[in-house]
Each structure stands twice: as structure tokens, then as C-alpha cells.
Amino acid sequence: MADLANEEKPAVAPSVFVFQKDKGQKRSAGSSSPEAGEDSDHEDGNYCPPVKRERTSSLTHSEEKSSGFRLKPPTLIHGQAPSAGLPSQKPREQQRGVLRPAVLQAPQPKVLSQTVPSSGTNGVSMPADCTGPATSVSPENLTQRSPSESAEETHTLEEKVPQKTPHGTSEEGHCEEEQAAPQAFVFGQNLRDRVKLMNENASVADVDSAAHPSSETPSATNYFLQYISSSADNATHSADNSTKFVFGQNMSERVLSPPKLNEANSDTSRETTHAQSGSESSSQEAAPKKESLAESAAAYTKATAWTCLLEKVEVITGEEAESNVLQIQCKLFVFDKTSQSWVERGRGLLRLNDMASTDDGTLQSRLVMRTQGSLRLILNTKLWAQMQMDKASEKSIRITATDAEDQGVKVFLISASSKDTGQLYAALHHRILALRSRAEQEQEAKAPPPEPGATRATEEEDSDEDAVLAPSGVTGAGTGDEGDGQAPGST
């Protein structure tokens, strides 16, 4: 190859100079800017600045001095070609265009090309190997090299090609798949296919990274696809979990457990007597292990229920021999002499009862009043003939009655509705009048009858008085007659 380059160099050299001058003013579509190209060269660590741009930094000068033979792809050359006034700098400029196959392209431009279009391709990676133009072997590059340099290039290429070839072939296959994927892209169209494609690409990238751990593989993230895959996984996971549990299923097995029943039975046996505990333990042993919910609940309530059976007691109120005539809801007041005011005793049911007397069978009545709720006795008095009763107002009656607390006669006020007050007043008035008439009759019956001798003496005395009066009258009349007789004789 060195001999071939030496033979073609004088024939092709002028055309190469003219071709690079015209080519230097055009930029490839894959490159973004001269600054971006220079940054990529800096990141690669093999940057060789052109002579036209004068750098003042020490880094560029040190790199320019220490730079030897460097392999750079011709697609990464940016900027204009050197002017025609500097022909001596042309060989150094031509050192950047080196014969290099497509499999040996640097990986760093691929990372830059993926970061820019990632937002537009919806996460589908487009490596720089696919977008950038493929390098071709030009005879001009061979003509610009010296025989020693071309020999060194061939030696280095032979050493580096076997190391990069497997990875390069995988990248070429991966590039062809990714070129077919983003063609005619519409947002949201065939989203499932893209998910599958990304999964396949990820698997291929994993295989490549496992084969070549030193190579840098870009990771394209698409949040829409991640959300769809995570939601699908969650849906399947929730569906699997929902089929496992059903509410209310096998409730008897969950509620009924033999240890808990034994504990409950032991508690009840402690509270009950020894005889009851023995009977319950025998019944539990005879009972089957698995019972229904209703049966177990009935057995539990029966075991824990305390049957408090009270003896029936006959209620005695003292009104068993009486007949109720009238009962009303009212409020009772008592007159306090010290404070000269009415004090409430309580409210409840006032009953008017009639009863037969044991002595002579006469009718007697009494008033009984108990408080509502507690049934405490607050009034218990009999009706008598000298009992005073008057109607204080349309809804109240004032009576005198015996007090059950101090057994003295006090003045009470009964307050109720107008209808109940009228009925009570009429019933009390009728019974009090009957008691008064009966009392008068008793008094007349109890008075002693007059004696017969005494009546005769009185009659004789009366007759004597009449006789005494009669002679005096007669004598008076005789004298009068005598006077009359004397008078005419005298005349």
C-alpha cells in the first residue's frame, strides 16, 4: 500500500487540494455546529486543531505538540479548508482525513446524536452510526500520506480491527433495525409495537454490553412507555390478588376456632358452679368439632347467659278492697304557714276511691295520690263531714286534708285541667254533702226522747197559770158591773 501511495501521489495531489477547498465550506446534516464538533473532538481526547484557528490556551498547544499519529473520522472535520496562501500547512491538515472503515467510528458522536432527537422520536434511539454518512476509502487520502505513515496506519488498523469487529457488526445490525422503526412516525400510533421493539432493542443492548463491558451503550428513556408497562403489570397483579380473596367466603371457618371456644367455655365454667361446669364440659365433648354459625352462637349464648329468675311477689297497695271512681293527672301543693306560700309536693295520679264501712255498711271515700315514676305516696286522706273544699280557680281546688308526714290537718291545692277539676269538684262536693246529712241524722238519732211524767207536770202548770188569770178577770168584771150598777142608782 505504501508503494501504491507513492506512485499515485504526484498525479492526484492538485485535485485533492481543490476538492478540499470546495468541500470545506459545506457541512454535513448530522453535524450541529463547529463548536459542537470541536467539543466532541475534545471529549474524545484526540483533538488536533487546524492551523487557521489560532488557539491561545496552553492545552491546545500542548496537544498540538504532543500529537502524533491519530485516527479521526473524516465526517467529524468542521470548519473551512485552509486558504490558498498557506500551502505549507496542507499536509498537516490532510492528516485528519485517514482511511478508516465504518466499524471503527468513535462512540462519542453517537451519544450526542441520541440526546438531541430523543424528544422527537418518542424514546426510539437513533445512533450516529445510522445518521452520519458512511466513510469511504478515497485515493486522495492515500496520496497525501508518506510511505512510512501509510505503513504505520496499516499496522495499527490490522491490530484494531479484530478488537472492534464484533461490536461493529452488532451496531450495524442494530442501526438497520432502528432505521426501520422511526420511519413515518405518528405520535401515539402503534404504541404497543414500539414497546415490544424497545424491549427487543434493550435485550440486544444488554447482550452487547455483556459482550463488551467497556463500550458505552446509551439508555433511551420513554416515560409514556414506562407508565403503560407499569400500569399493565399493576392490573395483572391486582387481578391475581382479587381472585385469591372473596369477602364473606368460608366465614364459618374464620369465625369458629376450637381454641377460642375452649377459652370461652373455660371462662364460663369458672363463673358457674362445679356441677354446671361438669355438664357443660360433657356436652362440649359430645358436640361435633365443626358446627354451623347459628348452632355455635346458640351454644355460646346458652353457656354465657345468666338466668336471673325472680320470685313473683304479690303487689299490695292497700286499695284492693276499694273501687276507683275517678283518677286524674294533677299537681299537688301544700300551704306552708311559716313562709306563707305554696310548696309543691309532686305530680302524679290522684285517685278517688269508695269503700264500704265495716261497722254499719255506710259508704266512705278517700283521696290517694302517688308520684309519677317512683310511685311515692304524697297524699292519703279520708273524706269527712267537716272537710272544707272550695274552687280557687277554674283549674285548681283548695281542700283541707290530713298530711301523711306529720298526721296533721293542712291546706292542699290540687292543680289540673279545667275538665278534670270540674269532675273532681263535683264528686267531692256530692260526697261531702252526703257525709254531712248522715252526720245530722246520727246526731238526731243519738238525742234522748222526753219523759211522760214531766210532760204532765208541765201541762198542770200551764193549767194553773190559766186558772189564776181567769179569777182575776172575773173579779174585775164584777167590780165593773157593780160600778155600773151604782152609777145608774146614783143617778
UniProtKB/Swiss-Prot annotation:
Protein's name according to its UniProt entry: Ran-binding protein 3
Q: Where in the cell is it found?
A: Cytoplasm; Nucleus
- InterPro entries registered for this protein in UniProt: PH-like_dom_sf (IPR011993), Ran_bind_dom (IPR000156), RanBP1-like (IPR045255)
Return the Gene3D superfamilies for the record.
Answer: Pleckstrin-homology domain (PH domain)/Phosphotyrosine-binding domain (PTB)
**Species this protein is from:** Mus musculus (Mouse)
Subunit composition? Interacts with CHC1 in a Ran-stimulated manner. Interacts with XPO1. Interacts (via its C-terminal R domain) with SMAD2 (dephosphorylated form via its MH1 and MH2 domains); the interaction results in the nuclear export of SMAD2 and termination of the TGF-beta signaling. Interacts (via its C-terminal R domain) with SMAD3 (dephosphorylated form via its MH1 domain); the interaction results in the nuclear export of SMAD3 and termination of the TGF-beta signaling.
Looking up CDD domains in the UniProt record yields: RanBD_RanBP3
Task: List N-acetylalanine occurrences by residue.
Answer: A2
Modified positions (Phosphothreonine) in chain numbering: T56
Q: Where is the RanBD1 domain?
A: 302-442
Q: Sorted alphabetically, which keywords does the UniProt record give?
A: Acetylation, Cytoplasm, Nucleus, Phosphoprotein, Protein transport, Transport
Q: Give the principal location in a single coarse category.
A: cytoplasm
Disulfide bonds, which pairs?
none
